[in-house]
Swiss-Prot record, chain B:
Catalytic activity: L-threonylcarbamoyladenylate + adenosine(37) in tRNA = N(6)-L-threonylcarbamoyladenosine(37) in tRNA + AMP + H(+)
Name the record gives this protein: tRNA N6-adenosine threonylcarbamoyltransferase
Binding site for Fe cation: H117, H121, D309
Keyword Repeat: no
Cofactor: Fe(2+)
GO cellular component, one term: cytoplasm
Residues holding substrate: L140, V141, S142, G143, G144, D174, G187, D191, N281
Keywords, comma-separated and alphabetical: Acyltransferase, Cytoplasm, Iron, Metal-binding, Transferase, tRNA processing
Taxon lineage: Bacteria, Bacillati, Actinomycetota, Actinomycetes, Streptosporangiales
Organism: Thermobifida fusca (strain YX)
HAMAP family: TsaD
Enzyme's top EC category: transferase
Amino acid sequence: MLLLAFDTATPAVTTALCESGPDGVRVRAARTTVDARRHGELLTPQIRTVVADAGVDLEDVTHIAVGIGPGPYTGLRVGLATAHALAEALGVPCVGVATLDALAWASGRTTPFIAATDARRKEVFWARYTDAATRVGDIAVNRPADVDTAGLPVIGHGAHLYADVFGQDPEAAEPLYPTAAALGEFAVRALRDGTPLPEPRPLYLRRPDAQIPGAPKKVRQPTAAELGRSR
Amino acid sequence: MTTASQPPLIMGIESSCDETGVAFVRGCELLADEVASSVDEHARFGGVVPEVASRAHLEAMTPTVRRAAERAGVRLSDVDAIAVTVGPGLAGALLVGLSAAKAYALALDKPLYGVNHLVGHVAVDQLEHGPLPKPVVALLVSGGHTSLLLVRDLATDVQLLGETVDDAAGEAYDKVARLLNLPYPGGPPIDRAARDGDGTAIHFPRGKWGDGTYDFSFSGLKTAVARWVEDAERQGRPVSVPDVAAAFQEAVADVLTRKAVDACREHGVRHLVISGGVAANSRLRALAEERCAAAGIEVRVPRPRLCTDNGAMIAALGAEVVAAGLPPSPLDMAVDTSLPVSSVLVN
């Protein structure tokens, strides 16, 4: 199995090529660039570079794994649109991995913790883990003050941004972002063990902001008589 | 990649607004043109909601590519080049199409051409009426754009003569439709209502009429219609929807065709292309035919399916830039929400 993994649901644009072998998962090549505003520019060239770094051809890839968020939507969709098209053109299967699960896996923790990423609008996407591999319950989006941490350490960019709210040292939030190497390892293990992975479809967790319009605004100023009536 | 026997196979991808379009073209031959629209999801909001459109593009992109390839009877590995809309349009919507196009280009190891949506609206006419004469004037009218272009060469020489300074013509249609309790999008229902109306019953203002530019303005027209309807209601006069629709439509078609004909005259151009969603409007077409005939100008209007946003327009422009031997775009190109028409190809 030669699995191409990438994630664009956080400011980190990250790609890795992972291979499963008899002695576990080997990361053949990986790159990460942190730039919250250039996912669309960075991802495809980064994939090309990682594949070249590993000394393989894109046609050698047997699986694609992509971070499905949650994360800021515009960046998130860059990864998913890329994954769908690559899988279609290469004729290989594509699976999803929750971005928070990749972040949790990257932490390597063996005791319970909370992973949190920036959801913008002064909120975080977060979930609780018993260890790096095991999430408990669903991923949620809340204001940091409304996250029930139960005294557990919080990791991730969300923990770094709101360290004061979580009452911990900003430096304790590492790792801040998921890596594609972790995401790829997570996916290879799940595929090998037959653990189900999500479909490669986005976790938005919020509905689009849109208001159903009311009646058209009046363009005429109301007359004095009309104003009098409304008082 | 070009064989003597047939022109290269171009895949075109469009996602600048609410239509996910994918098409396959060889030269001026359209092999398949598939569109998935999210217009119904926007209807209750009275306009395109960017986030709703972006979500729909992601869902529709790969299935639309698959459907278009099946319809064209081609395999993706047969594709010689990929063309994609880089702008102008909605950032999040454009980014879905551009990301997919880059991935196809990388996986298939084929050149990628990032092209201009507005110039695509002109290029698409070649799929219906054959190669465009040089030069042409193009009038692009849609929900997002109202522009007059001087096209000396589709691939290399496109000049903006004028554009709307506020609302697009199609936007004015949507807003007036709402005033008249007609459904969204407003173009078709206003056109239908106007058939039974008298376009001279009310005189609505023609924005920027005779101001010596090729710019347009439709915001004042929309407000004038709103005033007229409110006044009539306040005074207890009946509002004839057909008359208001016809008079509004007359004002739009009048100013659009007058400036288009003036532009042809000034530049000594004998061919006018009208494209974009509003090009399907019956009054605009009739008045353009009439005025152009009088001025000795030939009008070319693609069939309605090609006038609205689709992948065919992008594939048609892609075929043109490939034929011109222009270099492909880099894989790190960005979307450009306000890409000027003079940038036909991004590289």
